[in-house]
Every structure is written in C-alpha cells, then in structure tokens.
Amino acid sequence: MNVFSFIYLISIFVIFNIYAAFGEIDFKTQVLISSSLIILFGIPHGSLDNILFLSKNKISVFSFYFIYLLIAFIYLIAWIWWPYHSFILFLIISAYHFGESHFSDYKLDFKAKNFVFIVWGLFLMSSLLYLNSSELIKTTQFFFDTKQFSSIYSDKIISYLFHASLFLTIVMLAFLVYKKFISTEDMFSEIFQYFLIFITFYLFPIIIGFTLYFVFIHSFRSLYHEFMYLKKIKKNINFFSFIKLLIPHSIAAYFFTFLICYASFNN
C-alpha cells in the first residue's frame, strides 16, 4: 500500500464514522465538506501550471498566458453553444488527466503510454458515472441548463464503457508487469487502490465519493510531485515557500469559481 492509498483509507474511515454517528449527511453538508476540501487542496494542485510548464518548455511568459487564456476562452464559447458535446469532451480530457497523474509514480517509457493513461482514466470516470447514475440524473434536475446531461448518465454506453475499461485495465496492469514497467507488488497495490476507489464510489454519495478521490489521491499526489520537482530545480524551496507559490493562482481560481457558481445559482 502506497502512502496515498493509506491516506485515502483513513479518509474513508473518517467518513464512515461520521455516517455512523449522524446517519445520513444532507446535501448542503455534503457540499460544504466537499467544497472546503477542494478549496484547501483540490484547486491549489493546479496552481503551478505556469512554473512547471515554463521550466520544461522554451516559451515566454506572455505566450504561455495568452495560449492558456485563449484555450479557456475557446472552451467557454464551445460550452455556451454546444454544452452537451463540450461536457463529453471535458469528461474525456479529465479522464486522460487523471490517468496521466495516477501513473506519474512510474517510469512508463513506451509509445503506448498515453493509451494506458486514457484507459485508466476512463475506468475511473465510467465507474463514477455508472455507480451513481440515479443520483446524477436527480442532481441534473436542479438546474435548467444541466437537465440535458441526464441522457449521458442514463445511456447504456456508460455501462459498456465501465465493463470494457475494467477489462482493459486488468490487461494493462498484467502487460506493465510483464514488461517490467511495474513490479508485482506495484500491481497488487494498484488493484487495492482500485478496490478502495470503487467501494468509495459505490457506498458514498457522488459528491463525497469523488471529493475523497480528487483530494486525497489525485491532488495530494500532484502536490507531492510538484514539490519534489521544484526542489530539484530550485535550491531554496521548502514547505512554506511552496505554499507561497500556490497562493496567487489559487486566489485567481477561487475568484473565477465563485463567479461561475454565482452565475449558475442565479440563472
């Protein structure tokens, strides 16, 4: 069991005890708990994209921000005009991102590694949607502009995608062990983590389940790797200077997140 699985297991234990003590957690409390964790750990994990990208690529700061904001603007326009297809694209991109981050602990030096990332990511996303389809369909009814997404959650393709990606993930792990990209011990550690994620998505409401994964596995892993990378390229990096680097873009992200939420609730 790696450290992220251990932290994740502890978080599951804590949530179980909360349910045991108070019974069902109402929706507002779920949102409060989840949003607090995401604000503290989830959003900051992407706040160093500029530093990380500029340290690995020969591009000016202006060019980076111009391209970064241009992509965001194009996606915003696409969301306004084609929300259904834009949401599907968002799920696919998220799947790849989660897969790439998940395997950052291993040195996968082969051409098909992107296939590994997308397969694992699709397994994660399809598990989340497949195991919580009924809850997702109900949640989409809260807002007029999200009702159209209910057809995604009720579509049989989610079930097919879940079972296909589960099978491919098992085959993929066996392949990685066979090619010695990961050890047998790593494989069992991955299977155990998959099991924890699956159980979390199955037992808990989707907001709680996804937040536990997003914060305690994905964000913590990303923050750890970002810290270790910066320690290699900057001599004076410590915990407190690392936190200071996270603050500027985190504040900007909080501001735009607030604007989006405000617009959604007042639509």
Go through the PLM ranges and name each one.
Residues I12-I18, I67-L76, F98, I191-T200:
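Hydrophobic, membrane-inserted alpha-helices
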Residues N17-T29:
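Short, hydrophobic transmembrane alpha-helix segments
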Residues L37-G46, L91-S104, F216-E226:
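Alpha-helical transmembrane segments and their membrane-interface exit regions
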Residues K58-F62, F66, F73-S151:
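Membrane-interface helix-loop-helix junctions at boundaries between adjacent transmembrane segments
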Residues F115-L136, I158-L176, F192-I206, A252:
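Alpha-helical transmembrane segments of multi-pass integral membrane proteins
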Residues K147-L161:
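Short aromatic-rich membrane-water interface segments that cap or initiate transmembrane helices
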Residues E185-Y224:
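Membrane-water interface signatures at transmembrane helix termini and the short loops
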